[in-house]
Curated annotation (Swiss-Prot):
PANTHER family in alphabetical order: RIBOSOMAL PROTEIN S12 METHYLTHIOTRANSFERASE RIMO (PTHR43837), RIBOSOMAL PROTEIN US12 METHYLTHIOTRANSFERASE RIMO (PTHR43837:SF1)
Lineage, uppermost ranks: Bacteria, Bacillati, Bacillota, Clostridia, Eubacteriales
Principal subcellular localisation of the protein: cytoplasm
Residues annotated as binding [4Fe-4S] cluster 1: C13, C48, C82
GO cellular component: cytosol
Protein EC: 2.8.4.4
Cofactor note: Binds 2 [4Fe-4S] clusters. One cluster is coordinated with 3 cysteines and an exchangeable S-adenosyl-L-methionine.
Protein name, entry field: Ribosomal protein uS12 methylthiotransferase RimO
Required co-factors: [4Fe-4S] cluster
Function: Catalyzes the methylthiolation of an aspartic acid residue of ribosomal protein uS12.
Length: 446
């Protein structure tokens, strides 16, 4: 009997990507996985519902895939993810072409629901259960480059920032058992993964719920014992939760890259308070100084939200002054998105879109100069580069300072063929604002 083909469109963050990979893993025994949606009998759209632009992209994608039911092979359209969890009832009426809807806590039921739907049980077509207990786990079909993989170490969030809807969608913070994470990481390493990227809504809180204290430093130590893993990268570390044992482990552990993603979001105490952030400008700057003192070569990445309600020009200029003083290595900027059902959406002093855009542009231009100056200092230095792509002329890879998708890349030529997924020693010969150009010094640095 010919297997049905399943295609997946995954939108949103890397945490959503992990969900998509778990769904594909769940379906892989009964269905053939295809990257071509036009030939898929079953199409799954895993949506994002975090900000307005992401919601619109999700709706547009579902509508596009709905057309595949008329023009291509699609017989079953499934919508999952945060947008569905949040707006499932409305979307079912808006887009009747959706056959099955699954919320963020029901992925483990997807194969059963499809079978029941095909057999005529239409009541199974909408599962939007809310749970503060469930964590999606299971065998994954990786959608990243084979040498890197994300590992979600916790689900949900307890921070309740005033602009964010995630706790209402994903539930309270809950850590995965350490042995389950180690088992998954070991399996990934056996399949050729060399870089583990740890993610959660707040990675620094790992273990605080199930072990009674923060245990990220212990998890890092355990993961570093896995044969084949060369890099371990940590994203989404809330500044107020970064603790001394974690800093010490990052400093001492050769496999943990000296890179931290710390979502600051703002530096003005006035705006931080409005955001419901549990930190202050002094706490943030003290933490940065401690990190740089204990780990001199650490790369710090952060994100800022501009145009938050009641943000004054003085508040915004505090960010500019902060960046000029602390010169963070990597910075992302987002315009505030007014999300319904959040406290911030009801605040007075909403900022005009034109002012948000102006502040976003000004902040990015400022950081572009900082980034260029930082990259100039890398010229003539040598780095281990993880090779990820080859376009027929140039190889593309990353050094430890670069996370996939969100940071820059290293481009290089090589007279000899390089293997995708291998590490090579590269000398940097030229810099750009965010990218670097290098030449191969040694073919391998295993």
């Amino acid at each position: 009997m010919t297997k049905y083909k399943v295609g997946m469109v995954s939108l949103g963050c890397d945490k959503n990507r992990v969900d998509s990979e778990i769904i594909l893993g769940k379906m892989s025994s009964e269905y053939e996985i295809t990257n071509n949606a036009k030939e898929a009998d079953v199409i799954i759209v895993n949506t994002c519902g975090f900000i307005e632009s992401a919601k619109q992209e999700s709706i547009d994608t579902i509508l596009e895939m709905a057309e595949y039911k008329n023009n291509y092979n699609c017989k079953l359209l499934i919508a999952t993810g945060c947008l569905i969890q949040r707006y499932g009832d409305e979307l079912k009426n808006l887009i009747p072409e959706i056959d099955i809807m699954l919320g963020v806590n029901d992925y483990n039921k997807i194969d059963r629901v499809i079978t029941e739907f095909i057999e005529g049980n239409k009541e199974a077509s909408k599962l939007l259960n809310y749970s503060d207990e469930n964590i999606n786990e299971g065998i994954r079909i990786l959608t990243t480059q084979k040498e890197s993989a994300y590992i979600r170490i916790a689900e949900g969030c307890n921070n309740f920032c005033t602009y964010c809807i995630i706790p209402k969608i994903r539930g309270k913070f809950r850590s995965r058992r350490m042995e389950n994470i180690i088992s998954e990481a070991t399996d990934l390493a056996s399949k050729g993964v060399k870089e583990l990227i740890l993610i959660a809504q707040d990675t620094t809180q790992y273990g605080s719920d199930i072990y009674g204290k923060k245990n990220l430093h212990i998890l890092l130590k355990e993961l570093s014992n896995i044969e084949g893993i060369k890099w371990i990268r940590v994203l989404y570390c809330y500044p107020e939760a970064i603790y001394d044992e974690l800093i010490e482990e990052i400093a001492a552990n050769d496999k943990v890259v000296k890179y931290l993603d710390i979502p600051i979001q703002h530096i003005s105490d006035h705006v931080l308070k409005l955001m419901g952030r549990k930190t202050s400008k002094k706490d943030i700057t003290d933490k940065i100084e401690k990190l740089r003192n204990k780990i001199p070569n650490i790369v710090i990445r952060t994100t800022f939200i501009v145009g938050f309600p009641q943000e004054t020009q003085e508040d915004f200029e505090e960010i500019l002054e902060f960046l000029q003083e602390y010169k963070l290595d990597k910075v992302g900027v987002f315009k505030y998105s007014r999300e319904e059902d959040t406290p911030a959406s009801k605040m007075d002093g909403q900022i005009d879109e034109s002012i948000k855009e102006e502040r976003e542009e000004k902040l990015m231009l400022s950081q572009e100069k900082i980034s260029n100056n930082i990259n100039k200092l890398k010229v003539d230095k040598k780095y281990d580069i993880l090779i990820e792509e080859y376009d027929g002329e140039f190889y593309k890879g990353r050094n430890f300072e670069m996370a996939p998708d969100i940071d820059g890349n290293v481009f290089l030529e090589s007279p000899k063929k390089l293997e995708i997924g291998e590490f090579v020693k590269v000398k940097i010969i030229k810099n750009m604002d965010y990218d670097l150009i290098g030449v191969v010094e040694d073919e391998s640095c295993k």
